[in-house]
């Protein structure tokens, strides 16, 4: 059973108060993010066709939930894992220009997820994407956009701390930028997750860059699909979360692959045949805009700002019976 309940933990809010606070966090952050990044909200699909190549393959092993469509002679559709590829496609189709972007409320089901305090079968996030020029595909652009996302997080923390006196601010003024290789060099004997913990304990909040490619040790820091992020220009916003004494990932984002990076990464990932899928083909033929984008966990930031011990306190999902029994014993209000 993957459940940790901190000694003496008690939620400051009951279920109804929590629901009100969740809405407050989501409404404020969504507006701040859209303003800081110049984003327009758009509607998004819950499912896509497998042959479109638009679903997010995550680490390449997770099985999507699929179903057949009666009206279309049993044609199969897949519930999205994320909208990483769909968004880039939509930016081109909807007529967005340089410096403009979109965001959407993304709901997904990850049936193969190992659930714990911060992982659920149900994923809800703001998925966003913004158009850049090819010559902006560099670390400076990445850092600039990351800082704007972090600013929206800081503004939300200020707002929630003003509304609820039990909320103590914990985000540092400055976000620290560090690469996965720098962390491996600094902590060669630790696992990737242990390195993240050491870094956030020291800095409070980091943007961990360059995730997906092999490090000097021969192992990648973590898996990333080869056909959306450029592994040399991506990363995660990770913060220290005192309630659970852990490294807490809030957002994964990056500059997206161009035609060169896509070809290289498909070969590295051992799936060069994916370049024949429609979405990947459009990148190789330079038919899609160059973009930067990411996902920001809605339940994750609600957990963080409301100081909750379990993600089930801020979203409705299905949990193992043993987890529900233990949570009830310890007074956790699972939705």
For the regions a language model picked out, list residue spans one by one.
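A generic secondary-structure signal for well-formed alpha-helical elements
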Residues: 33-40, 149-160, 309
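Generic structural hydrophobic/aromatic packing signal, biased to beta-strands
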Residues: 22-25, 29-33, 67, 79, ...
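Generic recognition of stable, solvent-exposed alpha-helical segments in well-folded globular domains
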Residues: 20, 24, 28, 137-144, ...
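Class II aminoacyl-tRNA synthetase-like tRNA-binding/catalytic domains
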Residues: 1-119, 127-131
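Extended, charged alpha-beta segments that form solvent-exposed binding/catalytic grooves
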Residues: 99, 104-194
């Amino acid at each position: 059973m993957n459940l940790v309940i901190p000694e003496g933990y008690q939620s400051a809010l009951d279920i109804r108060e929590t629901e009100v606070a969740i809405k407050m966090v989501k409404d404020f952050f969504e507006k701040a993010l859209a303003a800081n990044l110049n984003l327009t909200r758009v509607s998004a699909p819950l499912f896509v066709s497998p042959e479109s190549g638009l679903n997010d393959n995550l680490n390449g092993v997770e099985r999507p939930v699929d179903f057949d469509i009666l009206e279309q002679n049993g044609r199969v559709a897949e519930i999205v894992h994320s909208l990483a590829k769909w968004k880039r496609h939509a930016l081109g189709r909807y007529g967005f220009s340089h410096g403009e972007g979109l965001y959407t409320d993304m709901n997904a089901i990850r049936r193969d997820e190992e659930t714990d305090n911060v992982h659920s079968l149900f994923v809800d996030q703001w998925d966003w994407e913004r158009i850049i020029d090819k010559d902006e595909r560099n670390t400076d652009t990445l850092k600039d956009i990351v800082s704007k996302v972090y600013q929206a997080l800081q503004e939300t923390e200020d707002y929630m701390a003003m509304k609820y006196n039990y909320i103590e601010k914990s985000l540092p003024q400055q976000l620290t930028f560090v690469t996965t290789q720098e962390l491996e060099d600094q902590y060669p004997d630790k696992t990737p997750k242990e390195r993240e913990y050491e870094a956030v304990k020291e800095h409070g909040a980091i943007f961990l860059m360059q995730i997906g490619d092999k490090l000097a040790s021969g192992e990648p820091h973590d898996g990333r699909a080869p056909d959306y992020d450029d592994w040399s220009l991506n990363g995660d916003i990770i913060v220290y979360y005192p309630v659970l004494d852990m490294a807490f990932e809030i957002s994964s984002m990056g500059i997206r692959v161009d035609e060169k990076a896509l070809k290289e990464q498909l070969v590295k990932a051992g799936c060069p045949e994916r370049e024949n899928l429609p979405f990947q083909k459009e990148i190789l033929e330079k038919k899609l805009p160059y973009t930067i984008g990411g996902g920001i966990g809605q339940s994750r930031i609600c957990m963080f700002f409301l100081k909750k011990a379990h993600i089930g306190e801020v979203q409705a999902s299905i949990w193992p019976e043993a987890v529900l029994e233990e949570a009830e014993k310890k007074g956790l209000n699972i939705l």
